[in-house]
């Protein structure tokens, strides 16, 4: 219930007027609100304004004015005295109002400080008013269909008690609906009932309320990279108009068509015309590039650096250290992408996930639910199980493929699970789960089942730990007790999962299956974003981690552009500027080798004989980079101006030169944003774009200086063919003697063939000269096709995911795109054709995996607004900037940079204490970026200042927040975790002397103990699929043992459920692919004699396998006890193959090998008949006997149905006839149960 409060009694002051202006620019929303409050009390009161912060929202402006005095705020670094004051009060979770310390300060816990802005506003006169003006920027959430949801904070539209009797709402603009042209019903019928607020309101949560109606005005401008297809509101009637004097419908003005009734919050749905296409948006900075360069050159520290070293690379390095501070001054590009992840039939069976089941030791009574969940998993998933109490006891060292052996081991372990006493360590189990190695194309899903009652300190630590690793996994939590609901709810919100709460006596199975269905929904994982920008630009990329995308999620990437060509050393006379080596790629070519020198030394030139090197090596140019710790300490002052020195080993992302085109105006620079750090990488943020003087001598490239900031550049995949797919102007004349004719010929052929000068690392081009699309030539390792194969089929299936108009290679033969041959030194060059230079552009390539299928999207945007439309130079004056909306894209970029540095600082503090320098630099960058851009940070706190003098108000109420302190229990939890595997039979290799008194007290034979006791040795590859354990005797669980143990514990579990859900014995028999076997355990699970199943089978081989006596007498089926004894429940007398061969088979004379292979084929065909018939019967049995529990076995049935659809049925039978025969079986069984004669029925299995 946010709003303006009197802190002495925490009573809200009523709102009298609310005026809101909004600006929706693509996925970003800017808000400017003016709120007027009235003090009804006869004495002055102190005001405290409470504003709810959305995720990644930035409040860039705040001003409270009363009686001519204006109060604003600034972000200051947190002081050590705040931590001591907050620790004295404890975490304070669940409090509804801010607490007060002994000094009278308002104290918030870290969760409250992250989600709420609490600011003192000064005194409000008796019967006076206070006007609060607020400016903020936030990201708009999206829905799975790409619709963006605009919801105003309830502090702008508080719920007020309606005037009774109320006048009826006038009809809207449309005849069918007053709210939109999309047919949404009138909100008049959905008006919520007024509820009187409680005596002590919760200022941190809940909708805001007002005791009386107020006036409200609203206006919103909507623009974006694509046109708006429509808009609607489920709450209000809207009016949409074009702007006055507008020449197009690119910007829409939205207002309210009817008066605001103060009974609901305002919501608007925006329908873009291209909801599932990537888009780029450009927002200019507060300074032009010329103004920014002049401002930097006027700095005293830059002038001192210029006096010591006038080199251009040193000046560029100076700029790189300031990137995070100058975000608001330079232009920003924003990438927005909401992929279409609508589910397709059969996607559940093809889903690739890693599922970790984290079971509280006190939840041993829910064994059936775990068994059902594991049996419902597709065969392509990875699975692991961990029991946690005071110790974390995983079943496997790392996740294993969901094979029959793995599922059997999990089920047998669950059967012997005993209740574990002791308080569960939530922090330790989260540390174990999130610390497991990641597997490529397998997004992680955690299922946390617990009845724990965590303390406030544990809850605080667990939530902060999940916030540090929020993109690593989704958490689906199940609260078995009410004490842990708040913790599990917050964990699910942070990880984009979902929380489920069980009432007493409620079954866990339906909720667990519902969560499994959501966990297996389509997803994009292993996302990498490649930015191609002009060589004159350096880029700061954020966020540093890109999590997997699920339906409704959108990818937002920010790129802050810094034009640095005015600071670089230009090429010497006689050298063509295009010869400068490109340092904008983090992907090495196969022939490029690192070599580092100390600062101040000359680069090492490594030449090769002509013809032995590649074009990339011959067109590269080196420049010196050091690698000395002493130089870092001497040249870097992390306190005054933090940032890694170019020679810093601990702060450098290794960046490799990449050859590119020889262009007249600029060379494209490659920057990559990916969630996967590469080998030898530590942490950095920007794409390199610096370059040194060119050299045609074919020298090896060296390490360029790293750049500070909050964006990691990753070694995702080789990018030998990653030049920007843009039309290339003809090269300008240059000195021909620098290159031989052979080199020039190879350069021309390479440019015409593949638009790149090097192959992907580790392999050569399969066919030299073959045209390759730039979005297809660099596929993630291990996932792309073999050399010579293409991804056309997979990308066509994804719905034309490439750019709408990719560059056709046939265009290169047209005059405007033709690379003209360069004459040799003996020939005279013809006069170059004067063509207008190409305008600079930025190009972005998004690569991801949907399951195991590579996907790719491309989008580009022109940078004419920054360079001007003409010759590529800076225009004299930039277009009019939208200063009224306070640079929303810039603010969100800065907020993402702050979040990146917070994670680096806090993770480094939690993982190790050795790299204090790197942690301190990240900490300082977060503080500096937060102060400059007003982006919130856990290292800063808002302080009330005078809006005119910008000085801190003396005597003003101070709001402090708790410190994001180190997890005090982390080290102890890690020690317990490390000791847990050694104390259990699961991980103690070769432990044969009995199990410890832990959760895994398994009562198995020697084979199963050996299978569990052999841990998987850790591998260095954390992105590949874990190796399947070798097939040996210790992993060979016999078929007889598997079948006999399938019904173990059945009676006990059914009695625990207290209901008649008897599908679990059948589910236990399902194999990992989804099939069932026609054998005795299956017949016992469905309670149908095997002879009856064979008689009703649509396969003739099954009916022929019956004994002649039983086949000749219908009474043998109607009354098994008459004349047959127990023969009806016996197995078929002969196997299908032997029944068809007969007893008198002789040698065919065709050889033993031929007969053996034919016999194997007959056996496989017979097994397929039995499995398909048993699977169809299992599906029909579930539909007829367990229809009430459909929500529990639907995933199992879906897996079985997908397996059936993938089979090629023998004997010419189709799937429809097979399922019809299975359904007819239960009709026949009903007549059999009624003891009717078989010849009276109009049914024959052969006619189905």
From Swiss-Prot:
Residues 354-527 form the VWFA domain. Residues 684-701, 751-764, 780-789, 1127-1145 have a biased composition (Low complexity). SUPFAM superfamilies: vWA-like. Residues 1-138 form the VIT domain. Residues 1159-1168 have a biased composition (Basic and acidic residues). It comes from the Eukaryota. Residues 595-619 have a biased composition (Polar residues). Pfam families: VIT_2, VWA_3. PROSITE patterns: VIT. Residues 184-204, 590-650, 672-710, 751-789, 1008-1037, 1126-1168 are annotated as: Disordered. InterPro entries: VIT (IPR013694), VWA_domain-containing (IPR052627), VWF_A (IPR002035), vWFA_dom_sf (IPR036465). PANTHER family: VON WILLEBRAND FACTOR A DOMAIN-CONTAINING PROTEIN 5B2 (PTHR46299:SF2), VON WILLEBRAND FACTOR A DOMAIN-CONTAINING PROTEIN 5B2-RELATED (PTHR46299). This is von Willebrand factor A domain-containing protein 5B2.
């Amino acid at each position: 219930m946010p709003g303006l409060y009197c802190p002495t009694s925490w009573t809200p002051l009523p709102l009298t007027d609310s005026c809101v202006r909004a600006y929706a620019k693509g996925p970003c929303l800017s808000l400017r609100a003016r709120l007027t409050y009235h003090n009804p009390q006869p004495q002055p009161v102190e005001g405290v304004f409470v504003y709810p912060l959305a995720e990644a929202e930035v409040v860039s402006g705040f001003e409270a004015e009363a009686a001519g005095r204006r109060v604003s705020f600034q972000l200051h670094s947190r002081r050590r005295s705040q931590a001591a004051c907050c620790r004295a009060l404890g975490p304070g979770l669940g409090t509804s109002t801010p607490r007060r310390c002994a000094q009278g300060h308002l104290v918030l816990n870290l969760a409250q400080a992250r989600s709420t802005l609490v600011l003192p506003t000064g005194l409000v006169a008796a019967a006076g008013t206070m006007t609060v003006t607020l400016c903020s920027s936030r990201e708009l959430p999206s829905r799975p269909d790409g619709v963006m949801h605009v919801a105003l904070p309830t502090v702008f539209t508080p719920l007020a008690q309606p005037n009774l009797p109320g006048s009826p709402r006038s009809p809207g603009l449309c005849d069918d609906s007053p709210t939109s042209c999309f047919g949404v019903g009138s909100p008049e019928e959905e008006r919520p009932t007024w509820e009187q607020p409680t005596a002590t309101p919760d200022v941190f949560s809940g909708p805001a309320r007002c005791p009386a109606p107020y006036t409200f005005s609203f206006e919103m401008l909507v623009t974006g990279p694509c046109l708006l297809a429509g808009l609607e509101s489920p709450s209000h009637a809207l009016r949409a108009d074009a702007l006055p004097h507008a020449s197009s419908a690119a910007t829409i003005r939205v207002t309210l068509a009817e008066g605001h009734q103060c009974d609901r919050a305002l919501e608007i749905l925006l329908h873009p015309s291209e909801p599932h296409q990537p888009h780029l948006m450009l927002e200019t900075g507060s300074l032009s590039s010329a103004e920014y360069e002049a401002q930097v050159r006027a700095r005293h520290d830059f002038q001192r650096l210029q006096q010591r070293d006038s080199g251009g690379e040193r000046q560029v390095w100076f700029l790189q250290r300031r990137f995070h501070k100058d975000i608001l001054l330079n232009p920003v590009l924003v990438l927005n992408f909401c992929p279409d992840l609508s589910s397709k039939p059969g996607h559940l069976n093809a889903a690739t996930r890693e599922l970790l089941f984290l079971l509280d030791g006190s939840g041993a009574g829910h064994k059936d639910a775990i068994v059902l969940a594991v049996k419902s998993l597709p065969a392509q998933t990875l699975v692991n199980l961990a029991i946690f109490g005071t110790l974390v006891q995983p079943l496997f060292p790392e996740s294993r493929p969901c094979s029959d052996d793995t599922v059997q081991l999990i089920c047998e372990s669950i059967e012997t699970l005993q209740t574990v006493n002791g308080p569960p360590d939530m922090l330790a189990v989260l540390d174990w789960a999130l610390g497991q190695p990641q597997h490529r194309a397998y997004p992680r899903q955690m299922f946390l089942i617990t009845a724990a009652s965590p303390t406030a300190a544990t809850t605080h630590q667990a939530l902060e730990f999940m916030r540090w690793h929020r993109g690593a996994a989704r958490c689906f939590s199940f609260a078995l007790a009410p004490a842990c609901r708040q913790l599990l709810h917050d964990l699910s919100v942070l990880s984009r999962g979902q929380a489920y709460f069980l009432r007493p006596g409620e079954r866990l199975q339906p909720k667990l299956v519902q969560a499994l269905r959501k966990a297996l929904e389509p997803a994009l994982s292993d996302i990498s974003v490649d930015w191609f920008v002009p060589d004159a630009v350096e880029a700061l990329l954020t966020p540093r981690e890109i999590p997997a995308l699920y339906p409704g999620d959108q990818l937002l990437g920010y790129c802050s552009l810094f034009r640095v060509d005015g600071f670089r050393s230009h090429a010497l006379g006689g050298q063509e500027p295009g010869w400068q080596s490109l340092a904008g790629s983090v992907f090495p070519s196969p022939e490029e080798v690192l070599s580092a020198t100390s600062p101040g030394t000359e680069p090492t030139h490594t030449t090769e004989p002509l013809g032995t090197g590649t074009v990339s090596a011959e067109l590269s140019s080196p420049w010196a980079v050091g690698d000395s710790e002493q130089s870092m300490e001497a040249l870097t002052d992390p306190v005054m101006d933090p940032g890694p020195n170019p020679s810093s080993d601990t702060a450098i992302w290794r960046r490799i030169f990449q050859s590119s085109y020889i262009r007249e105006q600029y060379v494209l620079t490659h920057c990559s944003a990916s969630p996967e750090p590469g080998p030898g990488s530590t942490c950095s943020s920007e794409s390199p774009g610096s370059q040194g003087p060119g050299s045609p001598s074919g020298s090896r490239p060296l390490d360029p200086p790293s750049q500070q900031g909050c964006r990691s550049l990753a070694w995702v995949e080789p990018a030998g063919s990653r030049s920007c797919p843009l039309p290339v102007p003809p090269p300008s004349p240059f000195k021909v003697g620098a290159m031989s004719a052979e080199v020039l010929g190879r350069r021309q052929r390479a440019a015409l063939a593949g638009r790149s000068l090097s192959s992907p690392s580790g392999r050569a081009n399969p066919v030299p000269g073959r045209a390759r699309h730039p979005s297809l030539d660099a596929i993630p390792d291990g996932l792309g096709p073999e050399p010579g194969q293409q991804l056309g089929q997979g990308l066509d299936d994804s719905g034309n995911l490439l750019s709408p108009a990719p560059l056709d290679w046939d265009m290169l033969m047209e005059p405007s795109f033709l690379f003209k041959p360069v004459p040799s030194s003996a020939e005279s060059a013809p006069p170059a054709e004067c063509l207008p230079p190409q305008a600079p552009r930025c190009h972005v390539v998004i690569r991801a995996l949907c399951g195991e299928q590579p996907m790719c999207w491309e989008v580009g945007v022109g940078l004419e607004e920054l360079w001007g439309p003409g010759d590529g130079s800076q225009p004299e004056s930039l277009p009019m900037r939208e200063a009224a909306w306070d640079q929303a894209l810039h603010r969100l970029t800065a907020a993402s940079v702050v979040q990146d540095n917070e994670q680096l600082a806090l993770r480094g503090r939690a993982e190790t204490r050795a790299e204090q320098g790197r942690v301190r630099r990240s900490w300082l960058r977060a503080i500096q970026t937060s102060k400059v851009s007003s982006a919130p940070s856990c290292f800063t706190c808002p302080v009330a200042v005078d809006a005119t003098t910008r000085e801190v108000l003396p005597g003003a109420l101070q709001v402090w927040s708790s410190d994001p302190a180190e997890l005090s229990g982390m080290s102890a939890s890690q020690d317990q975790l490390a000791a847990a595997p050694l104390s259990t039979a699961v991980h103690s290799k070769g432990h044969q002397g009995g199990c410890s008194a832990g959760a895994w007290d398994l009562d198995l034979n020697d084979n199963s103990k050996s299978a569990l006791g052999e841990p998987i040795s850790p591998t260095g590859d954390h992105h590949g699929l874990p190796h399947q354990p070798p097939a040996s005797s210790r992993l060979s669980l016999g078929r007889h043992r598997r079948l006999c143990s399938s019904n173990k514990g059945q009676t006990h579990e059914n009695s625990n459920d207290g209901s008649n859900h008897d599908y679990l014995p059948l589910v236990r028999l399902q194999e990992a692919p989804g099939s069932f076997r026609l054998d005795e355990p299956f017949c016992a699970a469905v309670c149908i004699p095997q002879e009856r199943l064979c008689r009703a089978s649509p396969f003739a081989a099954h009916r022929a396998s019956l004994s002649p006596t039983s086949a000749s007498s219908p009474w043998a089926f109607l009354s098994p006890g008459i004349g047959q004894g127990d023969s009806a429940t016996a197995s078929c007398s002969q196997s299908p193959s032997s029944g068809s061969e007969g007893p008198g088979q002789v040698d065919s004379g065709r050889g033993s090998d031929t007969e053996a292979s034919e016999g194997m084929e007959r056996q496989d065909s017979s097994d397929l008949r039995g499995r398909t018939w048993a699977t169809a019967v299992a599906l029909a049995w579930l539909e007829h006997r367990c229809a009430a529990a459909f929500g529990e076995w639907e995933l199992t049935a879906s897996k079985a149905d997908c397996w059936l659809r993938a089979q090629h049925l023998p004997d010419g039978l189709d799937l429809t006839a097979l399922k019809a025969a299975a359904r007819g079986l239960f009709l026949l069984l009903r007549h059999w149960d009624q003891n009717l004669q078989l010849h009276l029925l109009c049914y024959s299995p052969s006619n189905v």
